[in-house]
Amino acid sequence: MKLLKSAINALEHCNAKDIKIYDLRGYNPFFDYSIVATAVAERQLNALISQIQEEAEKEGFEIRNCVGRGSKWILVDLHDVMINFFTYEERLHFDLDKIWSNRPLVELPIKE
């Protein structure tokens, strides 16, 4: 849960909106949680990368990969946690919320 909290801290620092955490344990063999969030402005997307790097250094976790720099969808792979940070339009287009609508949500704020 520490990794999830760090990811949420980074998103909140970037003023992300409509943050949802989908529990994909036992459903997806590659990661346990997927975070979906919306950026109010495109410049927030790239700010997330810097903020996640700061959180990673501070909390001692590794960023496996980060893709989508300069696009409208940033995907950050934190091993067991994936962050999907979209513009509003891209989030509607790809609609991960619909794809994972049958999966449980982790409530915010995250408790230890």
Summary of predicted features, one role per range:
Residues 1-26, 40-47, 54, 59-73, ...:
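Long, contiguous binding/interaction regions
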Residues 29-32, 77-80:
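A short, glycine/Asx- and small/polar-enriched loop/turn
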